[in-house]
Amino acid sequence: MSSRYRVEYHLKSHRKDGFIDWIKGLLAAPFVLHAVSHDGDDNDELATTQRVRSQYAEIFKDIESLVSDKILFDERNDQYRQYIESNDVEEVIPLGQPRLDLLVPTIGTFFTQLPLEKAFLWEDARKAISSRRMVAPSFNDIRHILNTAQVFHFIKQRKLKSKDQLRMCTFDGDVTLYEDGGSIVNTNPVIPLLVKLLSEGVCIGIVTAAGYDEAKTYESRLNGLITALNGSDLPYAKKRNLCVMGGESNYLFRYYEDGESFGFEAIDKEGWLLPRMCTWSQDDLTQTLDFAEKTLYRLKKRLNLPEEAIIMRKARAVGIVPGHFKDPETGNMVKIQLDREQLEEVVLTLQNSLEGFAPAQRIQYSCFDGGSDVWCDIGGKDLGVRALQHYYDPENPIKPSQTLHVGDQFAPVGSANDFKARLAGCTLWISSPKETVEYLRRLIHDE
């Protein structure tokens, strides 16, 4: 019963990724055709595995070609669109769509080529995907293959000393650099990897939903990293390439050292806000947060959420967070837990309600489920990443093809705030801080 429930839950439309599901469907045919028993005959097993591996690899090679075709097609469309805008053309001739858009209508933008065949063979050598007869290639298998392909691309660009080498790497905080609700302590294995990236001239941005207008909280959560950075022999200019973008795109802090003191200093909004963000009126921002707050109070009552659940209003965000209650047996304060279904009902209803609210349509906002709470932030991670791209190099902004965002929340609808980062750069979809470390080691050391 519980197993079936879990499967059905993960098939909900807002939890699926169209591209990964499509690839799973393509791989299902060779898996089903070769899911046979050879009664212990090692030669037949080996032959079947080789045949399955070959067919899987061919599928990924074909997808690789479709991605390349889409990149070229999108570039041509962008050039045509710019030509129309600059020449005031009245008659617009549609150029059509790349084939991948027709096959996967929800597909996003690819900023780089992806060596998917090579990535599959590498993952298959480690995990023996082709040798499985009872378990088909899974969502996680494909997620890892896509991640590995992206890493291989940047390794190749570094070796070629290409103009599209990695220039900026951004990270989510919780579940990416540290466990949910945790912090970077001195023993965190990600620290030397981040310092290594900085030493190679790569800018580092921590783009987090945690929104605070002062630096102390970020200094506390990232203490292990900034302590290591302060004690390193990196040139100060490279140390300064560590920034925190708080509230997704609302507060920017940059690393500094001044004598014995070090930490993060706040950067004035005039120095980094994108032009489109400057056009948002304060009235629209306030009305959007007011509306979201009223919606949360209404949902708290309708869903009979615990009284201890707190609706918290900030300057640029509003959310519902779990409170605490006193355990009658132990006398200790215990954190309440909101059910997964309650969190998703709240975030999806909030998103749907705001979509029909006029002031919200004149700005950008982001509704997401943080795992134990739900928030509505002004802005979004795509804006946070883009702001950093321009802030680090105003004269020659970092391109999406030179940007890598690492995060754990990429579900396409409602509950995931890393999803929008796909609009601003390449991405790695990880599920734990351990995976972040593994991919960074591979990226840096070509392991």
UniProtKB/Swiss-Prot annotation:
Kindly list the positions annotated as binding IMP. Answer: 172, 174, 180, 208, 373, 381
Catalytic reaction list? IMP + H2O = inosine + phosphate
Q: Return the EC number.
A: 3.1.3.99
Xref: InterPro entries: HAD-like_sf, ISN1
GO molecular function, one example?
ATP binding
Q: Gene encoding this chain?
A: ISN1
Family to which this protein belongs: Belongs to the ISN1 family.
Q: Which UniProt keywords apply?
A: ATP-binding, Hydrolase, Magnesium, Metal-binding, Nucleotide metabolism, Nucleotide-binding
Stated role: IMP-specific 5'-nucleotidase involved in IMP (inositol monophosphate) degradation.
Q: Which residues bind Mg(2+)?
A: 172, 174, 408
Classification of source organism: Eukaryota, Fungi, Dikarya, Ascomycota, Saccharomycotina
Q: How is its activity regulated?
A: Allosterically activated by ATP. ATP binding is a prerequisite to magnesium and substrate binding. ATP binds to 2 of the subunits in the homotetramer inducing a closure of these 2 subunits and the release of the C-terminal loop, thereby activating the enzyme.
Subunit (UniProt): Homotetramer.
Designated name of the protein = IMP-specific 5'-nucleotidase 1
One GO biological process term is:
nicotinamide riboside biosynthetic process
| UniProt cofactor(s) | Mg(2+)
Active site residues according to the UniProt entry: 172 (nucleophile), 174 (proton donor)
Q: Which residues bind ATP?
A: 126, 144
* SUPFAM superfamilies noted in UniProt: HAD-like
